[in-house]
């Protein structure tokens, strides 16, 4: 839908797309909202019941999925990057900053880059982790940068100026400020007139694949 296939083929990159949440469970309220439960697992390990039974997407992306890919496909998992959109962008930034030796390149489209500060993130973190905000910090890209986590290469972020979630839910300037203060290289581009949709993603997709290819093939 985002039109990545041609760019993946051009650069010789395999693309692995994990789901937003685990499947097969049926907890009360799990399927009610697009921004929680089966619509948005936020790539963390839940600690609150009942979510802690299966909502362990952090471990899945960190451990199980890379191992499965390595076993089943002829790819070099030592040269891996990570990227995503919106909540997936949150996951990409968070995972990439926590495990820079595993994910050498990072990019995101309209990410939730400071989830502890916005309604989407507060709802998810409270629901999955509880109200103690200290437990949120390890899953918040903005807090991770402030705590000293780094990506050795420049992070690329694209954000649409007409995104309806820009001011309430995304607030990229918060993450930008933390990166400046911490010395984390970041290219954050505000794209005039674009919204939160796949048209925005497909327009910028080529640049993101070039970003990852340059780093993963040793050209940067």
Describe each model-derived feature in a short phrase:
Residues 1-220:
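Non-catalytic cap/lid and distal C-terminal segments of serine-dependent acyl enzymes
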């Amino acid at each position: 839908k985002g039109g990545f296939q041609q760019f993946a083929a051009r650069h010789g990159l395999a693309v692995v797309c994990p789901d937003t949440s685990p499947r097969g469970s049926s907890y009360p309220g799990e399927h009610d909202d697009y921004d929680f439960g089966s619509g948005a697992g936020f790539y963390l390990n839940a600690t609150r019941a009942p979510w802690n039974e299966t909502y362990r997407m952090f471990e899945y992306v960190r451990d199980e999925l890379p191992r499965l890919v390595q076993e089943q496909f002829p790819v070099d998992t030592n040269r891996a990057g990570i990227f995503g959109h919106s909540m997936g962008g949150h996951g990409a930034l968070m995972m990439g900053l926590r495990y820079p030796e595993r994910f050498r390149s990072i990019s995101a489209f309209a990410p939730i880059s400071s989830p502890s500060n916005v309604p989407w993130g507060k709802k998810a973190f409270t629901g999955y982790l509880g109200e103690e905000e200290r437990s949120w910090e390890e899953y918040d890209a903005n807090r991770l940068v402030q705590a000293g986590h780094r990506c050795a290469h420049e992070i690329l972020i694209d954000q649409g100026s007409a995104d309806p979630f820009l001011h309430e839910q995304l607030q990229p300037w918060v993450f930008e400020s933390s990166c400046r203060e911490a010395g984390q290289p970041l290219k954050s581009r505000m794209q005039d007139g674009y919204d939160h949709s796949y048209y925005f993603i497909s327009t910028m997709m080529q640049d993101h694949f070039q970003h990852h290819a340059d780093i993963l093939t040793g050209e940067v």
